[in-house]
Structure formats: C-alpha cells, structure tokens
Amino acid sequence: MVRSRWKGIYVAKELQNYNTVSNPTIVTTERSSVIIPYYLSKTIYVYNGRKYVGVKITEKSLGRKLGEYVLTKKVEKYKASKKVKKK
C-alpha cells in the first residue's frame, strides 16, 4: 500500500538530526526511510541484518526508500552438475 499523502514522507529521526560536519559517515538501520535531497552525493550505510552496506545517493535515487538498494537475502547460485563419463 502507498502511504497517505497527508502524512508526508517518512524519514527516520536519527537521519533528520544527523550532523555530517562532525561525523561524515551516516549509519542507520531504517530501511523504510525515504531518500531526500539533503543526502545527495553522500554515502549512507544501511544495515541489512548481517552487516552495513554503503549506498551512494544520486539524483536517480531521490524519493525512493533506502531498503531498495540493500539486499537482505543472499542470491543463490546453482552449480552445474558434473556429468559422469561411461567407459
């Protein structure tokens, strides 16, 4: 479902009050926060459940959520089965 327009966009309080002058790295666990223009050309480290993954913010990513750029599940790679040669 889409968030109601009258509520506005959701940005975590820890991201709103972040001072990049004293601490240039932004670290958060809020995957549901919307990317706003204040974070343009900065790197935000988002927690995916195991480790923090860096997300570089560009103009194309404005208005989207941080969780869209951080995968939480490992991509499964299937190995090719070995064929047995008959003698």
UniProtKB/Swiss-Prot annotation:
Gene name as annotated: mrps19
Main location: mitochondrion
One Gene Ontology molecular-function label: RNA binding
Family: Belongs to the universal ribosomal protein uS19 family.
InterPro entries linked to this entry: Ribosomal_uS19, Ribosomal_uS19_CS, Ribosomal_uS19_SF
Keyword annotations: Mitochondrion, Ribonucleoprotein, Ribosomal protein
GO biological process, one term: translation
Species name: Dictyostelium citrinum (Slime mold)
Top-rank lineage group of the source organism: Eukaryota
Entry annotated with the keyword Ribosomal protein: yes
Protein's recorded name: Small ribosomal subunit protein uS19m
Pfam families, per the entry: Ribosomal_S19
Localization, UniProt: Mitochondrion
